[in-house]
Amino acid sequence: MSQLCNATPPGISVRQLCLTLGQQQLFSQLNLEITGGKFTALLGTSGAGKSSLMRVIAGLTPPSSGQISGSDGLPLTGRIAWMGQQDLLYPWLTIEQNVCLASRLKGEKADRDWAQYLLARVGLSQSARARPATLSGGMRQRAALARTLYTRQPVVLMDEPFSALDALTRHQIQTLAAEVLVGHTVLLITHDAAEACRLSHHLLVMGTAGIEASPPLLGLPPRAADDAGLIRSQAALLKQLSGIAR
């Protein structure tokens, strides 16, 4: 069975990035280095440009100027998987067929063994033939996570993927994501300071002046909700966010 991520994944290098949409300049001369093989969370005020930055990194929105590449100097094109807030499962397909969607879109034969392995990893083996409408929100996000991993891409971009879930389900899916995404380069956008501190190796805060790093986090993710270090990190992060919001 193929592993989730065989080779050392690249980091993400953003250099002198500028983006203007219409008459609004979202960011200018932005520089950013995201460590390969680690989980990095990006937070900030609403409208700071977090989702726009992620879309530029993903190649969905062209930048006005600047350069984005892997830390190995190669383009990130073809090496990125995406997971958003909406699961975007096709209702007429089974869960297994949704997981294999990338193969279908490429006109390739589905790797059912790989899909079944991933469904087992996310606890959905018994739901492989079910339709999305029969699953809970948490189960659908598990399926979306398996679909993200199916492509075997080393870089995973996540735009608030857990925000629509109830607290307990969100905690469970956070833990699962931290476990199955080990060895990937992950960039997570979130407004939840606790989620960011629980899941991440590195924290970044985006404001009108650019992006700044937060103090290092203690321990390894996923951290327990009552971990003393997590609580201290969350307090420091909230203070930092309050500062950029002024």
Predicted regions span which residues?
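Helix-to-loop junction immediately C-terminal to a conserved catalytic motif
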Residues: 58
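Conserved ABC transporter NBD signature motif
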Residues: 65-80
